[in-house]
Amino acid sequence: MKKYIIALSVALTPTLTFAQTAVSKGDPAAGKAKAVAICSGCHGIVGTQTAFPEVYKVPKIGGQNADYLVVALKAYRNGDRNNETMKGLASALKESELADLAAYYSQK
């Protein structure tokens, strides 16, 4: 039984590692162009915790983990996160554009 558990652990380790890093790596330069076009109106404001209208809090996404950003954008797109503006924007993005934006913001 002990050998079985060890063998199973060794066999599953690469699978679990891959699952955590399965988000495709994007192109930061392409992400910057997309960010300027659609994201900077809210996320590009100095002091990113407020934007127009001031009642909405805009999170700081610069320096955030790229995988987290992709997951968050997908959550907006499929309705798991509730923000109509972000849902509309995320729904218009291709998978490669999600990865590009995430790569750009993760390097800020």
List the predicted regions and their residue ranges.
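Residue-level hotspots at or immediately adjacent to binding/recognition sites across diverse folds
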Residues: 2, 20-25, 89, 104
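Sec-dependent N-terminal signal peptides
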Residues: 5-13
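Periplasmic/extracellular electron-transfer cofactor-ligation site
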Residues: 23-26, 32-58, 78-85, 107-108
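Soluble non-cytosolic domains of exported or imported proteins
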Residues: 29, 33, 63, 92-96
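Stable alpha-helical elements in mature extracytoplasmic
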Residues: 35, 65, 72, 82-85, ...
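A structural feature that tracks compact, well-ordered secondary-structure segments
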Residues: 59, 71-76, 89
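C-terminal capping alpha-helices of c-type cytochrome domains
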Residues: 67, 78-81, 89-108
